[in-house]
């Protein structure tokens, strides 16, 4: 029960920011509406361009929602050094998507995903932090963040031999995550397209 409560609290951390950015988008849309603002909202005016810039900033949390959840969850779920846990989760998520990109690049026909067409022209793909990868959306982010947080909680305080002391703490967590993310990425390449087909089929 305590674990469920902690997970619920962790999920709330990123969600709480949605309200602010939603308000920003609401004001930007309102002030760019010619019906309300008249000629002031003409596309060539400074007013329109200014609120277009504000609007672009308002979309940041929704455009990068996966990264927000990946970083946000460990801040509440890590038993110690939550900052290091968040950084490890971010690194793990980037490695996960980079491995997926490399696998799909090397075996495009096996997994039915051609990255050469670009993410805009291919269903089920997305660019995350500049990495073309499978669109595992929030679910993928939560799973990867959970795995990395578990690794962090288990191995962050692990004492290594003195000659390997430089690899303790955060570095050790990231090292383990590197080798864990490779099979996780491979499994995702096999399983996720099937899940997408089941989800999108009528």
Give the role of each language-model region.
Residues 25, 178-179:
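Short amphipathic alpha-helical leader/targeting segments
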Residues 4-168:
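Early transmembrane hairpin of solute transport permeases
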Residues 172:
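Duplex nucleic acid-engaging cores and interfaces of nucleic-acid transaction enzymes
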Residues 199-202:
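Conserved small/polar residues in nucleotide/adenosyl-binding loops
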Residues 152, 183-194:
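Hydrophobic alpha-helical membrane-associated segments
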């Amino acid at each position: 029960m305590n674990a469920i409560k902690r997970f619920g609290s962790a999920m709330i951390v990123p969600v709480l920011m949605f309200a602010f950015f939603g308000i920003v988008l609401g004001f930007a849309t309102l002030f760019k509406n010619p019906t309300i603002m008249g000629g002031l909202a003409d596309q060539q005016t400074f007013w329109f361009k200014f609120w277009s810039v504000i609007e672009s900033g308002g979309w940041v949390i929704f455009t990068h929602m996966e990264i927000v959840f990946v970083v946000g969850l460990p801040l509440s779920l890590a038993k110690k050094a939550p900052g290091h846990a968040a950084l490890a989760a971010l690194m793990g998520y980037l490695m996960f998507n980079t491995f997926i990109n490399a696998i799909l690049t090397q075996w495009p026909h096996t997994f039915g995903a051609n990255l050469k067409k670009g993410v805009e022209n291919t269903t089920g793909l997305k660019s995350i932090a500049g990495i073309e990868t499978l669109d595992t959306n929030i679910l993928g982010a939560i799973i990867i963040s959970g795995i990395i947080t578990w690794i962090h909680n288990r191995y962050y305080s692990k004492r290594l031999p003195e000659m390997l002391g430089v690899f303790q703490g955060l570095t050790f967590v990231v090292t383990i995550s590197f080798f864990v993310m490779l099979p996780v990425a491979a499994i995702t390449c096999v399983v996720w397209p099937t899940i997408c087909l089941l989800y999108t089929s009528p």
